[in-house]
Amino acid sequence: MQPFKRRALTSDDDRPYADTDSMPEVDLDVDRRRQYMEQLNIFDDVSSGAYMLELEAAENGVKYDEKEDLLNVQIPPKYEDQISDPDGNRMIILNIYVENFKSYAGKHILGPFHKNLTMILGPNGSGKSNVIDALLFVFGFKAGKIRTKKLSALINSGGNYESCSVTIMFQMVKDMPVENYDKYEVLTDNCVCITRTINRENNSKYRIDDKDASQKDVQELLLRAGIDMTHNRFLILQGEVEAIALMKPTSKNPNEEGMLEYIEDIVGTNRFVAPISKLMHRVSLLEHKSSQYGASVRRHEGHLKVFEKAMVIGMAYLNTFNNLNYLRGIRVKHNLCRYAETMRDAKMSLVTRTGELEENKDIMLEAKDEVRKKETHERSLNSIVTELENKRIDWQSKKNDWHARDAKRKQGLKSCTQDLGKLMKERDEARREKFEIETAPENARISKQNMQLEWDQLKEQENVCQRTATENLIKYDQKSSADRAKHDDLEKKLSDELLQSMRAKAELDVSESELKDMTIMMEQGQKRVDELKGTLQTMMAENIRDNTELNAVTTELQDRKLKFDKAVEKLPHLKSTEQLLRSKKYELDQEVIEASNTQEVTYRHQATAKLHELKEAGLFPGFKGRLGDLASIPIKFDTAISTVFFAQLDYHVVQTSDECRIGIGFCHEYKLPRTTFVFLDHLKDTDTSGMDSTMKFPAERLFDKIHCVNPEIRREFYFLIHDILVVDSLEEATRIDKKYPGRHRYCTLNGSILNRSGALTGGGKPTTGRIRNDNNPNMSGVKKVDLSKLRAAQEKHNHALEAHLKLQLKQEEIRADNGPIIKQLEIRKRELIMSTKEQKTRIAELKSSIAAHERRMVNYREVTVEDLDEKRAQIADLKRQVEESQKSSAKIKQQIEQYKRKMDRMFMELVQKNKDSIEQAKDRMGQLEQDIARQTAIIENNPSHLEQAEKKLSELEHMCLEKRSEADALAQLEVGEDVKGIDIINAQLQTSTASIDAQRARYTEAVAARREADAAYQTTVDNYNMVKQTYDELMRIIDDLENKTMADNAELDIIESAWMQPEKLYPPGKFVRYNDPDIAAKMTDGHVVLPYECISMIEPHREAYEEHEARMLEDDVFEDTANKICKLEKDVDKFRREFDNKGVRDYAMIVSLLMNEVTSAKKFSDKLKAHREKLNELRMARFNEFSEALAFLGTTTQMLYQLITNGGDASLKFVEEGKSTDPFDGGIKFSVRPAKKSWKLIENLSGGEKTLASLCFVFAMHHYRPTPLYVMDEIDAALDLNNVSLIANYIKHSERTRNAQFIIISLRNQMFEVGNRLLGIYKIDGKTYNIMVDPIAVEIKNRPILKIFEEEIKRREKLRRAEIEPEIDLSNGLSNVVIAPKRKQRRLEMLKLSDFGLDDDSDLPEFNRFPPATRRELSVEDSDEDDEPVRRRPRRQVEEEDEEDELIEEATPSPPPIVVQRRVRRSRH
């Protein structure tokens, strides 16, 4: 990755910081600083430069977050080795189980695999690679890596299979020492099986040891086992070896991987890349900003003078306004003193009038006391009348009580008849129960016999199936016999108690019924007929009174209904009128509000209002208005037209060019702001036919969205806008412009423009409100409305609405008052009608009853009090017997329950546990036992039940006879003569009525006397009111003076709050003074700091006002003050028109920007220093860690390549080593020097040489960070026989490879012959099969036969040697030729010859031995001094030595092939 370019940075010593002694430190955020710059129209080169740096970083693939804390970034620790188990344990693949996977139809077992080296061989197309695909499938690789488009294609297509699955059995093993290399210890507790299944719907499922799992769980398990799923170093497929050789030194884009990234990914230093990239970008930004902020300080110091003039004018306006406020305050204080003097005179006159008022008040109070006496007398008479009325009501109540008792006696007879009916029903029910009891024993015996027969059958089945439980059942019967006997006795006792309780309850019911009958009989008297006659007279009197009240209620109800109906009829009309009046009021209110607040509601040009005033005055009749106010547009397009045509919308429209000149003259005369006039006549000869064009445009035309009634104004809009099209975004505009290039102009909804040439304009802050929108079509904001007329109409309308509301309220009160009364009267009327009807019916019934009683009157015996007491005592004794019987029954039930629970527990313990196998038969037997017991109880208890039923029936018949006799007796009884009581009551009622009439006459006289006293009192009240009126007039004067005083005090409060401060010159702005204690919080909230220059220019008018004492001024002084006020008001108005209200704000903003640039320059300088230190720290850490790993990998790759190629060399170095400050810029260079050749980059080698060098690099990575599993697919395809043998022997015999499991697919004999296991793959009829071969086991099995073959071979070899002895001598002579040792060979201590199966080099021929390691001039290993690399010798010396090497190599013949073959054979042992 290329580093970012550094910007020039001003040094810390010569930064142009401004003098900041009088101002605090200012630190604006980015948005607020940008806002200040835009408002002041200052170009922000800091932000623009930073934006370019952001684009540059994005192009380089840096994901940058400005808020990220890069100084405290956490770098993850170094990677740990995948197989660093301290106990030497590792996970290996034991077996692979495949089912319907690819070419494997059905179930197959691949294995067992060897713990180190397993070779897979077979013909092309037989399915060797499917073994690796099965591994990748379980490991969770995607379909593309498994050579298919989708996972469901992995299912075998030869049969109708719905799914396929692969299971890998992993086994934890511990390697034995070297002498027992082939042996290992299996740790059975750590074995695991991973299964993955896929179906036709592409649904995949993982299982770990037959438990559902996720892919994440599988990958975590593999990672714990040491299989690196992140870098996939364990997997080397066809062609991937050469891919290493084709890698560039470093990647040029994120989609490819270079040698540097490949190594960093393995080493782990890639964790430094992202933080270093972010820090480099951050340093570039900080360098740019620190430099640019220093330059901004110098620029803003020059801007101060530009904004100072407007600030001075604003402060002059502030001082003039405060002087005016000061003089107004003095005038108000003068008025307050004058009002106080006038109020003293008024209060003295008030004292005189107060005495007269008190005198008249005493006279009025005496008259009022007389009225109160009359009222007291009136109330006393009224209370007497009320008391007499209450007495009459009491006598009436007694009369009603007498009638109620008579009705109760009638009810007694009715109750007696009902009781008789109930008793007869109970008697019939008892007869039916008796019949059932009589027939129950025979039915019970039949049922018992049938159930006993069934029980015997079930018992026989139970005995057959439950012989093992018989003894326990016998034990249970023996142990529970005593308790069962007690239980039966208690049940019998309980039955007796319940029978006794039932009898007592029956006697109690009979006694209570007799007591009730006796009470009813005792209440019967001998005066029944007299009582009925009295009731008849009372009922007739009530009937007359109710009829009279009914007539009065009917009359009042009709009158109130008439009033209520009229009110209800008027109210709807009144309410509709009210709605109209309120709507009109709302419209007037809105017009007043709109006229008053037009400037706040919408945008208005400062000259528009004045021009409208001139038009209304008749001075400027041709003025039409501001162009933006003469049309409207939907609010969606407001931003687009207001931003693009904001200047044109402020044009002021007139009719002719002469009126334009008149308007310009008015602007000069009244010093109005600069504006543009446009006249409509210039469009008469202009072709505007296109505004109504029917042509179809590729997007909406902005002109079509404008709503305008006046056709001339509409033409003016078209002349300015033409056919510009409006779209949502610039992307859409660009897309349409490509389709119709150069044909239209486009504008976006936020105000950006795409011209016909393709140039973009706009992009600034969007503007709104320059034209009316359709949501507020009546909002003009330009025409000055006569507020006085509007407010007068508003007040008049309010009075009309108030009068209407009073009328409506009166009608609603009539409705509200009469509505409830009408409902009450209607209810009362219905009650009286029902009462009169009932009274008529009752009168007829009473007359008939009186006649019947007079005919049937007979004598009967009365029930005495002694009889009642005797019956009550008998009932109490029966209740006591019932309670005692219930208590005894409850106690017996508790004992029965205890015995029952005891037997149940015994049964559960002894029997129930042994009967689970015959539960159904046992349940049925238990049910039958209960039914038999129930039938037995019916048979045994039948006599007692029958006796009870007969007794109950007899009792009920007896009670029926008694109740019938009683009812007959009551029916024949008649009330005797007893009218004396009712006569007395009637007499008392008449006496009470006469007394009430007399007292009412006296009460009427008292009312007349009270009214005369009221008239006299009213005369005194009138006199008092006349005096009070004079008193109130004085009070009104005083109140008026107090109100004026209050108003002036309020004006003083306004003056106190009206003092102008610099903060009020621009109300929308928020300011804070430099001495404010909360300045930091307010600055954070967006406040602008007021400069010291502004505050120092404030004149002390407020202090002078506060020191001025309140007093009356002399006339000439007061007049002079008034003149000064008039002059100052004109000056204030002049300043208001001339000064820019944003002047102080702009000056404060430029000062704040200046202080912010000073603060930012210091802040970014400090940040830059800290980030540079952090960047250098991370670069050094990355370089040190990577250099250490690179040195190891380079040395190991070189050593392996030298050993395997017998004279070759390899090197891994930085491309930019010694040329750049950042060696990572150029990447890693993999250079190789094959035997007898020159140095070349690996991509320039032949295919076999690339493969050999890449494999050395792969094995070097295994040395650096080993992994327990390697899967290789035909890595030897490009190698010759010799190199294949060397690679195979290295994999098998190296100590470094013994701690890993290799699964290799190969078609080369030299490779698979060294395998510890051979997995043969073959195909029959399109289906793949396999066979696993153990070469060692086969060799042991065939050893006797091989011994015979070897002896025969030796005999024949001896004969052959005798024939070709000359050739052998020649071969031995050639074997003594020694190849010159390679000079400057590096001594390698990390690998040993034992890795290749050799104890030392004495077993090798002399030409294959290691040269003495005495010369290391070209070594890249570190020296002992200061850990610095040894410098290379001069280029000329190296070239001379290379020439010597070439001469020696040319003079040295190659060894014969037989020597190499011998070395290979020796290395196998």
From Swiss-Prot:
The keyword Iron-sulfur does not apply. InterPro entries: P-loop_NTPase (IPR027417), RecF/RecN/SMC_N (IPR003395), SMC (IPR024704), SMC_hinge (IPR010935), SMC_hinge_sf (IPR036277). GO terms for cellular component: condensin complex; dosage compensation complex; nuclear chromosome; nucleus; X chromosome. Signal peptide: none annotated. One of its GO terms (molecular function) is ATP hydrolysis activity. Keywords: ATP-binding, Chromosome, Coiled coil, DNA condensation, Nucleotide-binding, Nucleus. Residues 9-18 have a biased composition (Basic and acidic residues). It is found in: Nucleus; Chromosome. Residues 1439-1449 have a biased composition (Acidic residues). It comes from the Eukaryota. Component of the dosage compensation complex, which contains the mix-1/SMC2 and dpy-27/SMC4 heterodimer, and three non SMC subunits that probably regulate the complex: dpy-26, capg-1 and dpy-28. Within the complex, interacts with dpy-28, mix-1, dpy-26 and capg-1. Interacts with dpy-21. Interacts with dpy-28; the interaction is required for dpy-28 protein stability and dpy-28 association with the X chromosome. Interacts with smcl-1. Consists of two putative central coiled-coil regions flanked by putative globular regions at the N- and C-termini. This is Chromosome condensation protein dpy-27. The gene is dpy-27.
